[in-house]
Regions:
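Short, ordered loop/turn segments at secondary-structure junctions
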Residues: 79-81, 147-148, 172, 264-266
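Internal gly/pro-rich beta-alpha loop/helix module
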Residues: 109-110, 115-205
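Nucleotide and nucleotide-moiety/phosphate-recognizing core
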Residues: 35-115, 123-145
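Short gly/ser/thr-rich secondary-structure transition/capping motifs
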Residues: 94-100, 148-153, 214-219, 272-274
Length: 290
């Protein structure tokens, strides 16, 4: 299973303190991860629209523009200026290269959203909404830097959230990207390392993403094993039995030896499930199928 985080501010601070990284080093690696993905997927000379916010997520985008400017047709759009120290530094570097902010084009091969990262906590203002509407209307391949702008840490999202084909999230997976609401706007998800491998960057989390390897069925190697060897699951039925029947069938498929549904009614069941009006004495696990 993989760790999920509501935000990674504390992980960034830990990387600075424990591994002597700097915010600028981590930002450069974030930009390199974006650059590498674009170089792997798009031919040289493609038009790359990079839309940057005024903070550090925008600074990632500014650094990306610097890395791509010689090989691609980079179109930089910086609607709100640069406010964070690192954004100002990245903008100074672009100024030295002669790269200036331009108006939004009518189209581009690639659209990079670097407006807001996972720290967004306020409603989107009308100016931002207008920009996101314009970006979503473009036909190019859409990449979100860290998270799609408009997606909040709790997994809720603004109606105008950037609809990405690919999200390159920085450092670690964010919990909000796996909410039901986010499924249609994050696209493919790639985690970018920020100067150290993610196993060093991460710390234990109370939130996890299950993987197929976590769902291994019991290994039945004993020749004398029988249905009583692998536990007895009791599932309490609600007013409607459908959920309990589905849970019971899933329990058997996952390896439970016996499954009994508890109900005050005589519920019709598949032959492999048992029905009882009281809790069996040999129950080893209880679930609510409601």
């Amino acid at each position: 299973m993989q760790n999920l985080y509501v935000n990674v501010t504390s992980l960034d601070s830990r990387a600075v303190d424990k591994f002597a990284l700097s915010e600028e080093i981590m930002m450069e690696h974030a930009a390199i991860a974006l650059e590498r993905t674009i170089r792997e997927r798009f031919v040289l000379g493609s038009s790359i629209l990079i839309v940057c916010g005024s903070g550090n997520n925008g600074a990632d985008g500014l650094a990306l523009a610097r890395l791509l400017e010689e090989s691609y047709d980079v179109i930089l759009h910086l609607p709100f200026g640069a406010s964070s120290p690192l954004a100002k530094l990245q903008l100074k570097r672009l100024d030295a290269l002669g790269i200036k902010s331009e108006r939004l084009p009518k189209n581009a091969d690639v659209i990079v959203d670097a407006l807001f990262g996972s720290g967004l906590s306020r409603p989107l203002d009308s100016a931002t909404v207008k920009i996101l509407e314009a970006l979503n209307a473009l036909q190019g391949f859409k990449i979100a830097c860290d998270v799609p702008s408009g997606l909040y840490a709790d997994g809720t999202l603004d109606f105008h959230t950037f609809k990405a084909n690919l999200t390159i999230t920085m450092g670690a997976l964010k919990r909000g990207m796996f909410s039901d609401a986010a499924k249609d706007i994050v696209g493919e998800i790639v985690v970018a390392d920020l100067g150290i491998h993610h196993t060093h960057y991460e710390v234990p989390s109370q939130w996890h993403l299950l993987e197929a390897s976590d769902l291994r069925l019991p290994l039945r190697t004993t020749a004398t094993a029988h249905k009583g060897t692998y536990g007895h699951v009791a599932i309490v039925c609600g007013e409607k039995a459908g959920a309990a029947v589905i849970a019971g069938s899933a329990s058997l498929r996952f390896g439970a030896g016996l499954v009994t549904l508890l109900s005050t009614e005589n519920v019709p069941l598949p032959y492999e499930l048992m029905l009882s009006h009281s809790l069996p004495d040999n129950t080893t696990a209880i679930a609510l199928g409601m």
